């Protein structure tokens, strides 16, 4: 059975759409990440689905904080 975890990370709302797209791409390259997209209703929430045996939420958040040092789990 595959392990699956889901997290939502709050990013600064002023991040440009091109920056959000780039950030999604950067998160998707992690081994174990199957989904990384910004929420269509709340544009500053990044939803990530991943296998916690392959990558941790802390590693994902660390990468997101390169774009927004105040990013946090929601």
What is each of the regions a protein language model found here?
Residues 22-29, 59-68:
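Short amphipathic alpha-helices in soluble, non-transmembrane regions
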Residues 1-3, 38-41:
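Short, flexible turn/loop "capping" segments at secondary-structure junctions
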């Amino acid at each position: 059975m595959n392990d699956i975890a889901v997290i939502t990370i709050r990013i600064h709302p002023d991040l440009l759409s091109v920056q959000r797209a780039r950030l999604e791409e950067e998160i998707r390259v992690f081994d174990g990440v199957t989904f990384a997209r910004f929420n269509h209703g709340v544009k500053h929430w990044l939803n990530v689905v991943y296998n916690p045996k392959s990558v941790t939420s802390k590693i994902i958040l660390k990468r997101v904080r390169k774009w927004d040092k105040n990013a946090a789990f929601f």
